[in-house]
Each structure stands twice: as structure tokens, then as C-alpha cells.
Amino acid sequence: MIASHKPNVPSGGSSFLDGQLLIAMPTMRDEQFARTLVYLCAHSAEGAMGIVVNQPASHIDFTDLLVQLDVIPSSERILLPKSAGAVKVLRGGPVETGRGFVLHSADYFVENSTLPIDDGICLTATLDILKAIAGGRGPRSAVLALGYAGWAPGQLETEIQANGWLNCPADSDLIFGEGVDTKYNHALRKLGVDPGMLSSEAGHA
């Protein structure tokens, strides 16, 4: 489920949207992305890869996953640091849903395993970070996503032009904050958009 190497993602560039949040618009045709926020981990001419940050994985607890993956024995569950219990498990997207990706603050970094993205946010997809979290040596902030969202070359640009997405700068609260159910409206308000008045008019930030 968790890989042993650095995630394979498209290499980005200055003209792309790495580190931005995508906000699904009412015109989004794919129902699995309705009212989603997607943090773009990589975006280039080769395509794009992102993590949905506002869809909880129902009935999945982070501490249960640590036991299932043999990171800790079941008997040590009660010994986990409080920070481990606070890690949310999200549905990161429809691609490779059996694989885990940890978005986290930049205070945790492992060479050849951690991908720095932007503004102090990184991506790691190895068991080492789960062991670090379980041992109280992990990042200050983290979420575990199961699966990811992927786009072929030019696909995301086409969806944005078709008014499928708005984009806005990401911040730690929108990624790691407590209110998963309120993140969508929070992101819209960050752009000065009233969620109650949201229309299908084209445009992006």
C-alpha cells in the first residue's frame, strides 16, 4: 500500500499549477470530483497529479491502518502519541486507491523519499513516514490519502478551460485543518466567491 521509494510524478515548471488547490465547479461532469478540493502535487506538460483533501475515507482510522500494515502491533495502539491519532485518512482520488500518500509539513524530510511541493508542504509515500509518526518523530501536520487524482497531458488544462475548476493558492489550514466538511466553502471564500451564489460562469484565479 505504501511504496518504498519516492512517488513517480510529472516534473513541474514555473508556468504550471504545482502547489495550487483546484476547486471543482458546478459544471464538473465527473461526479466523483463534485465539490472536491484537489491539492496539485505536480503539473507539467507530462500531465498532473493531485490529492483530494476534503473527502474523508469512511470507516478508516489511521491507527487501524498502522496495525494492518504491521507498523505497530495491536497491543501498542494505546501507546501511540496523540499526534498519530490526529492524522486524518482521506480518499485521495480514483487512481491507485490501494496506495497511500502522506501530505505533510516540511519539518519531515527524507532524501529520495520526500517530494517537496510548495510553501512548506511535502509528499511522502513510504512506510518510513508512518513509522516516524507512530514513534512521535513525524511531521507536525499530516494527512494520509488513499489514491490520487491523475490527468493525462493537456487534460487538466482542457478541464480548466471548460470551467470545470477554479484554482487558488493553497494554505496549511485548507490541507491539514480540522473542518474537512467546510474546506470547500472556505476555499471559495478565499477567492472572494460566495458559495451560495456560485454559478457556472467561466474563469479562474
From Swiss-Prot:
Family membership noted in the UniProt record: Belongs to the UPF0301 (AlgH) family.
InterPro entries xref list: AlgH-like
NCBIfam families assigned to the protein according to its UniProt record, in alphabetical order: PRK00228.1-4
Membrane-spanning ranges: none
GO cellular component, one term: cytosol
Gene3D superfamilies recorded: VC0467-like
Organism: Xanthobacter autotrophicus (strain ATCC BAA-1158 / Py2)
Pfam assignment, any one: DUF179
Name of the featured protein: UPF0301 protein Xaut_2594
UniProt lineage: Bacteria, Pseudomonadati, Pseudomonadota, Alphaproteobacteria, Hyphomicrobiales
